[in-house]
Amino acid sequence: MFGSLQTIDTVVYFKALKCRPKIEIAMDIQKEIENISSQIIAKYKPEKIILFGSAALGKATPESDLDFLIIKKDTPYYGADRIRELSRLIDRNIAVDFLVYRPEEWEQRLKMGDPFLKLILLEGKILYG
């Protein structure tokens, strides 16, 4: 398999090129989305899950992460605590970013016209709720 050699400071890294068919990569990503979302539903009991970012747009690559927006009533006050709580519960084989909002926070941000959340609603895929 061919790859590219990169030097960062004094350490040399070899980055293998992904030589798999796009359909195979897409199927692996879809399986991981289903795996993670089913775990979130079973273990975290959210009101809603929205997939957003490159995976929702069908543009994910092997280097992409998965982005999930989750709405849940009973979550810790601080955002970092919410992410920590969720991250402990979910087994995954790919990089994942979670955004967790309480329903009232979600509604308030939408009413304020939050452009990022509007984009998530426009381009994201509702997986649950």
Name every feature range the model reports, one short phrase each:
Residues 2-48, 56-63, 72-129:
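Catalytic core of pol beta-like nucleotidyltransferases
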